[in-house]
Amino acid sequence: MEQVVDKSIFFRLKIFVASILGFIQGKLLKIFSICLLPSAIKKVRLIKNYREQNANIAIVVLCEHIGDIISCEPVSTFLKTKFDKTVIWIVNEKYKEVIELFENVDFVLPVSCVSEYFYMSLFLKSFEIHNLHFDKKQCRKYGLVLRNNNKLFHIGNYVKYGSLLQTFSVTGGLPMLDNKPHLMLDEEDRFPEIDYPFCVIHVESNEPTRTMTKEKWIEILSHFPDNRFVEVGLHSELNDASNCCSIYCGKLSLVDSFYLVKKCSLFVGVDSSMAHVANALQKRSLIIMGRYHDYDNYMPFSGFDVNMKIVRSSEQVRDMSIEIIVDELKEIMKN
């Protein structure tokens, strides 16, 4: 009995110490974030110098992630065409090359993290800023919290009200936009070695509930022995499928992967960054979507058209039966 009590006390003490250490670590990270201030001030000066030559400036702030950023491309088009704005887009440096594909963005300003923009915002009060982040966006690196006066949507409810673009545009103080995004890719063929018709397949997701097991995916592909698939993503899941080429996984830049999607005849994948790329490139697509949190009929994509076919389930994607996916894919491949 004493041993059980001792273990219980030890366990509680361990949790208490861990929480204290976590609290201290969080506070220290916020203190250390001050090291970003010189860089932030330098970038504020860049913006102010830029304003001297371009008076009618609007700053769009959306630092991450790929799918969110691509979905919000129409924000820049709206500001440019409606108000003739010179558009500056502040984004995480990892995604700078994505914004460079937005036709109506005049200047891309990369930051290392959300906290760097937090410090920049202290000196940008006189600028027109459209912060597309939901209120209380927390920096993953330093923990600083970005505030937004538009509090209608938040991480817990935004999928209930519309597409990413619809909720993000309102969050940024704009009308509710619902246009299709566009990526400005040229006609260059970056994959001349692929000289046959193929489908791009992307099975990775940030959340395990949004994708299926490797075994299920391989079984789906086994129903199409005469079709060629090329997998994109950071990691290969389908290298055991005889009709799937996975050599590009983890080896392409973001923009190279966009060109691969552009070249394919069909995109197949889950609700993920590459699905938003396919939407922006107006590719024929089969997108597999299931229940997400408490919602089983959400629509993250804007400008929806006949090129995109969505297979839905009231279950999470990981629990879906493959039959409905195989049937839809067969129907699409007939045309």
What are the language-model segments listed below?
Residues M1-N335:
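Catalytic machinery of carbohydrate-active enzymes
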